[in-house]
Amino acid sequence: MKYLLILLYFILSAGAVNANAKALAVRDVFTCQMEAFVQWDWEKTELTGYQKQQFKFSITDENTVKFEEASYFENLALNISYIGYKILALNSEDGNIVAKLKDDKFSIVAISYDASDFITAKCERL
């Protein structure tokens, strides 16, 4: 009986932690630290690594995420294609940029005729 009560306590407390986690919402602001930034250049057929930066972005309305200007993203605005409890999916109007945020993991891919960029970062909600 004692073990059953202990097990029940742990199950209920795990549920309480999840219930208190905050869902993604309009006006949320995230600060991120890049872990990798690489670019494939089709003409040179080479992969180049770039300096990792910090950047910020916010969910400005139900349809838009905007990045601050002091980074590689320079006021980039992306459309929200999906927003869930802890997941955010983004894309550009032309479909050349796709980004995902799940928990604290952020990835963004940009594709053009000349090059493809890939960035990963760890993010924290402010």
What is each of the regions a protein language model found here?
Residues 36-39, 68-75, 113-115:
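Short, solvent-exposed aromatic-acidic interface loops
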Residues 58-64, 83-86, 100-107, 125-126:
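Short, solvent-exposed coil/turn segments at beta-strand boundaries
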Residues 62-97:
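Contiguous, well-ordered beta-strand patches that form the walls/edges
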Residues 15-22:
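Sec/Tat signal peptide C-region and signal peptidase I cleavage site
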Residues 26, 31-64:
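Short, solvent-exposed loop/hinge segments that bridge or flank secondary-structure elements
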Residues 51, 113-126:
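Edge beta-strand at a domain terminus
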